[in-house]
Amino acid sequence: MPARTLMIQGTASSVGKSILVAGLCRIFRQDGFKVAPFKAQNMALNSFVTTEGGEIGRAQAVQAEAAGIEPSVHMNPVLLKPEADASSQIIVLGKVAKNLKASQYYSYTPKLLEIIKDSLNHLLANYDIVVIEGAGSPAEINLKKREIVNMRVARMAKAPVLLIGDIDRGGVFASIIGTMELLTKQECAFIRGFIINKFRGDLKLLKPGLDMLEKRTGKPILGVIPYFRHISIAQEDSVYLDERQITSASGTLDIAIIRLPHISNYDDFDPLEEPGCNLRYVSNLSEIGNPDLLILPGTKSTIADLIYLKQQGLAPVIAGMAQSGVPVIGICGGFQMLGSSILDPEKVESKQDRIDGLGLLKTTTIFNSHKRTTQVKARIAADDGLFKGLKDINVTGYEIHMGQTTNANGQPALHVIETPSGEADYFDGAVSRSGLVFGTYIHGLFHNAEFTNRLLSRLRQLRGLPATSTSSIDKQEMYDKLADVIRHNLDMSKVYEITFGRNHG
């Protein structure tokens, strides 16, 4: 039987396409199918490194995990990573191809279309079902002639399309009808039904609107997915950060993450959202407060974001907190900022060839055009301060960075013991003599349950807070919960009929 395709498009960005694709991948896997996700082109700063060292959008890695398969560059052949100068780094089949402004990019898309087609065909040859995710809206008038991710891919894959709208933000009926009105008759024929997402309230009160929508468009409503918070799955859009709830209680650890303008891979910190931790993202002095732990996350534009910290007055505050004993952790670009200086002689990141860092670690970073992307296995090398008792804990993660950092202090953060390429036995990152300032290039560190649980226990001890039981997120359980929610609220018999062209028992 030839492989089948199903495509999820949305009325806008952040309506729930990525999560729905992950849930459908899980359902198809549970039902015995070999299923893979696919997104022709993704624009995101949250990325993932595959086993072969290729970089793809984090959402496709999550979807592959939900499908029970290894992520591949073919699942996201084109990744755009916005940079500080209104250009984007173009990543093709997992590797950096070039940096282009939008006006330059569109002359490059005919070549990309061939690569997209080859990747799609690769998946179709190896899986029973390919669930395809669109981007933004298929009805963007200014982009329709040049887009390579929505209806053009639907035509290429001969994929039936389900259109999803977000009712939580209001205007879902107008957005769905407006989308249909702006599509051509041929494009409308691809859309086989609608899904209403993030609904709160009484479904009976929604029924008149659903009836009107079906009557006006001639397309069925396949389901109404409720708004949920009890399922923790990595998110891709930074809009997600705006929706974080801040809670506090006696005995709670207060963890502040600096929300850099070009923050990337913020899903690094999802495991810190557990009972007993108040995780918050801060952008200015008025929000920073008195945290128990301060984190500088990864960024796509280290120099620009370091300038931002200085302009906002955050740089001296961060340095002052570290000097007063508040632990500070820097990941990737955040690690680079913690050092003495950053040099950019080739102008890889900016027009500046040098900038002073925060001076909390005795490190120097030199940018070059080579981008390092690899998965790693490592052991914690630090054994003082915040990391006392954590030495030799094994962790896994991945590196995605430009530039090399030298450590004049000599105290590394981690000892890398294995990579897929065979490169191993090297040291990563740096730690201050006090053990309270820690920097590393390794993303995904907090996704290692033993490391995170023991780190938080040590932090509570240092801050004079009572010990609590720790927990870790079971990702497989979360994917199953997501599948349960979708099965319960989506007409899966209709979805199977649309996908296979017949009823599926």
Language-model segments: what does each one mean?
Residues 1-320, 327, 344, 369-370, ...:
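Flexible phosphate-sensing "switch/lid" loops adjacent to ATP/NTP-binding sites
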Residues 332:
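Catalytic nucleophile serine of serine hydrolases
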Residues 339, 343-350:
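Extracellular/periplasmic helix-exit of transmembrane alpha-helices
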Residues 350-374, 380:
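Conserved P-loop NTPase catalytic core
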